[in-house]
Design a protein with these regions (language model features):
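Acidic/Ser-Thr/Pro-Gly-rich, low-complexity N-terminal segments
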Residues: 1-11
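Acidic-enriched and Gly/Ser
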Residues: 10-170
């Protein structure tokens, strides 16, 4: 006798961009963009966080990030290799609080004096923060990343051939 298979409960579909927006809106500080030497982006991000701790401004500098993307490179004619690379070469995004007049100069100088940083995007002496929408557009998942995650999730939930599902037929 065949047992009826109960339909598996589907996890609620979560829009990755909406989830990212929700997470971003809960974070303190504003996002600023730094110019850096190309090729030094990851090192600058790491150095900024170390300097924030060393100069005791970690309560004002919350995050330094370099948007990355995964691409497939084809080498030697047919060898495919997944490579992670900087999405926007020469730029680092820093989430910080420059609203306190007593500490803003120290925070600004900590960032500006980091090796390989050439300056802030915007006014030379008064950094201009990104709007929320600009920050989401630059730091959020790209449509390609969303599609890849959805494809991977669909592939993970699809039953494999020969996965033990049996079909009972009436006969004999």
């Amino acid at each position: 006798p065949a047992e009826s298979a109960e339909p598996a409960e589907k996890a609620p579909v979560v829009d990755p961009l909406a989830e990212f927006r929700r997470q971003m809106s809960a974070l303190p500080g504003q996002w600023y963009v730094l110019h850096t030497y190309s090729g030094y982006e990851r090192r600058v991000a790491t150095d900024i966080m170390a300097r924030a701790e060393n100069f005791e401004v970690e309560d004002y500098i919350f995050d330094a990030t370099v948007p990355m993307e995964t691409v497939i490179e084809i080498k030697n004619g047919n060898k495919k290799k997944e490579v992670s690379r900087v999405r926007i070469p020469g730029y680092v995004f820093v989430r910080m609080d420059l609203d306190d007049p007593e500490t803003s100069d120290k925070v600004w100088r900590t960032i500006k004096d980091t090796p390989a940083v050439t300056g802030f995007v915007g006014d030379r002496y008064n950094p201009v923060p990104l709007t929320f929408e600009e920050a989401v557009a630059q730091l959020g998942p790209t449509p390609e990343e969303i599609a890849a995650k959805e494809a991977a999730a669909a592939e993970a939930t699809a039953p494999e051939s020969g996965s033990g599902t049996q079909i009972a037929t009436g006969g004999q």
